[in-house]
Amino acid sequence: MTRSPFRRLVFGTLRRLLYLWVRSETINQSSFTLNLDRSRPVFYALQSPSISDLAVIDTECRKAGLPRPVLSVAVGNLIEPSAYFYLTPAPDWLGRQDKRGAPPTLERLVAAVSQNPGEDAQIIPVSVFWGQSPDHESSAWKLLFADSWAVTGRLRRLVSILILGRKTRVQFSAPIHMRELVDQNKGHELTLRMSQRLLRTHFRNLKSAVIGPDVSHRRTVVKGLLDEPLVKQAIIEEAERENITQEKARERALSYGNEIASDYTYSVIRFMEVVLSWFWNKIYDGIKVSHIEGVQEIAPGHEVIYVPCHRSHIDYLLLSYLLFRNGLTPPHIAAGINLNMPVVGSLLRRGGAFFMRRTFKGSPLYTAVFTEYLHTLFTKGFPVEYFVEGGRSRTGRMLQPKTGMLAITLRSFLRNSRMPIVFIPVYIGYERVLEGRTYLGELRGATKKKESIFDIFKVIGALKQRFGQVSVNFGEPIRLAEFLDGEQPDWREQELAPQFRPDWLSETTHRLGERVAQHLNEAAAVNPMNLVAITLLSTQKLALDDQAMERVLDLYLTLLRAVPYSPHTTLPEGNGRSLIEHVKGMDLLAEQKDALGKILYLNEQNAVLMTYYRNNVLHIFALPSLLASFFQSSSRMSREQILRYTHALYPYLQSELFIRWPLSELDEVVDQWLAAFVEQGLLRFRNDAYVRPEPSSREFVLLTLLSRAIAQTLQRFYMAIALLLNSGPNTLNPEELEDLCTVMAQRLSILHGLNAPEFFDKSLFRHFIQTLLDLRVLRKDRAGKLSYHPMLGELAEGAAKRVLPAEIRLSIRQVALHSNEEEQNAGNESGAA
């Protein structure tokens, strides 16, 4: 095509005409990030003949300063008139393709590199996507012309250009070095076939990652579910149980399938992209994305399950938007059935949502249909998204994982593990969450309302506020096969029946949920709101001198940079002063001036709201805050003492906050933090002991503020222990202890003026009690009453003395004693009645 100047002129004219309409871009700037050896010739491999694709690739190469595919190139003595070839040859006039032969250019390349030991050629696979969508059998007319798995003809491509040409994406992939293949010394024919196979596999995996696997239309999928053995058996059992005909039970199963299944539609995805592009840049100050390149590398050839944290209803839309913008297939998203409302439900369904009921109890047929639907998605390799927390976090903490979807995923993988499953944790951090005021009411004790996507529209009146930036961090992937190898090494040899439910499933699913939560927290995006919140909420009056605030924030930034929480954690740019100005610009930080300077403070409403943003990063501050707490009641401690008390308390903090380090790594991390404290003057190391600064020093004030970040958590631990010890063994069951803890915490919050409703969150006490049971510090007798190990007393009188001031411990013990007396009096009155 480029052998003569005339043909080059024709090609250039066609390209310019094409770009009167077409707009193209590379996926994730892939044309600019190629690791090319500029001294070696470059060739471009295209999957199939297309003059329009070649024109787009040539344009993107010119933009990126890459060698152009339409110009000649030399490999040793071989001179090729152009630097591209098609892996699949053009069809003849009857539409037939001979896929057995190799591209002539590739054949000559293999020969040239083989004959010249000093030569190499770099082959860059390039794909052009005219719109992105999974293949449907029937759908909106625009979707008919989007890239799919169907064979594309000239007329279809022309219409695709007209309809979708303004959203054209190009993926340049890592180069294949021909020298590496030739040096395997397999001979000309084998090397040629190996090159073709590598390219075919690459194009297939890339297409699956970008436009989704070859998935049939929704109606076909739903009807296909009814023929699966698991669902057929459930239909028979439903008919017998409900005393109805099998045909009636089959119709019921079909209705369940239609209720559940998504109706993925490209036109809706494209519409959402346009709307959301406006939204993220109008309401928010854009989106900051980190570590998505790891997802782009792992997506081809894997069943990807995205497991984001859940902070807002717009989480549903955010991840799909980002994936689409970065050249990855938007996932099928598990959504609560409450969102399946008129108009909104249809829009979400066409955007990839599939709907699930809050509980499957009492409906085995529904369970079978839902389970089989997910199994179909997993085995076809279609990306899926679900929230392991279940609902949105109202407190800003990572909620305890709900293991239902994880269990379904595990059982599906045990049935069919040919498609490797990888979980991708996604941390979504808002500087200001849209539903913040709604959460504020619930934090203050208002009854939790039923979730509805219309919660978003309730905040429209507040959109004049500044909402800051959204951060999305992709965490370390969890490969399910590797996880199971560590938990159950013989899992591959076990039964693979659809209803197989091994004895170890529950415990393994629980540990998988914990692993996901830990990886989510590892990917936390620390923002200015988080750091200002954790600083001011650690002061007694929720206020701090402007200069002192700047020093604290600078210290926190320095410490977090010195001892990174994880490679996937991100920190804000700038210094303490820039963080203060940023939060002030969002009207969440009040200021009062006097003759001595400026005081920054939180009003009552914002103080409660800021607990949400503090809790986002509490897991990052937990360990350094615990270490700082030791020096509030002790002026000096040896390393051995610090490690002993840290090991005593750490398991409870780790369990509640999903902290990443196992006990085996704890000593090393503690040493890193102690070294950072010494470096910043928060501690001194003298005579084999760590010594705190003078109580009147600035450094001691900083150390004290840091210690208070985790103070309320430690106080809750001590409350439960004090109530248990005062009650005596075999007196309370877990529910009674939980209720007493909640009442006691409410009392203490009034007595000490704590404006943090989560301080008496019943679920936190419930989890702490369960952790004590898991660690065998507590035991249940036959009547369900709690007895305790002697180490509980040691925990209260040893470790607690090190981390809680004497007045706090005394106050807790007094309230605990009073609570126990009231409980006993109530019991006596009940007995007398």
Swiss-Prot record:
Pathway: Phospholipid metabolism; CDP-diacylglycerol biosynthesis; CDP-diacylglycerol from sn-glycerol 3-phosphate: step 1/3. GO terms for biological process: CDP-diacylglycerol biosynthetic process; fatty acid metabolic process. CDD domains: LPLAT_DHAPAT-like. A motif (HXXXXD motif) lies at residues 310-315. It is found in: Cell inner membrane. The keyword Cell membrane applies. Keywords: Acyltransferase, Cell inner membrane, Cell membrane, Lipid biosynthesis, Lipid metabolism, Membrane, Phospholipid biosynthesis, Phospholipid metabolism, Transferase. InterPro entries: GPAT/DHAPAT (IPR022284), GPAT/DHAPAT_C (IPR045520), GPAT/DHAPAT_LPLAT (IPR041728), GPAT_PlsB (IPR028354), Plipid/glycerol_acylTrfase (IPR002123). It is a peripheral membrane protein. SMART domains: PlsC (SM00563). NCBIfam families: plsB, PRK04974.1. This is Glycerol-3-phosphate acyltransferase.
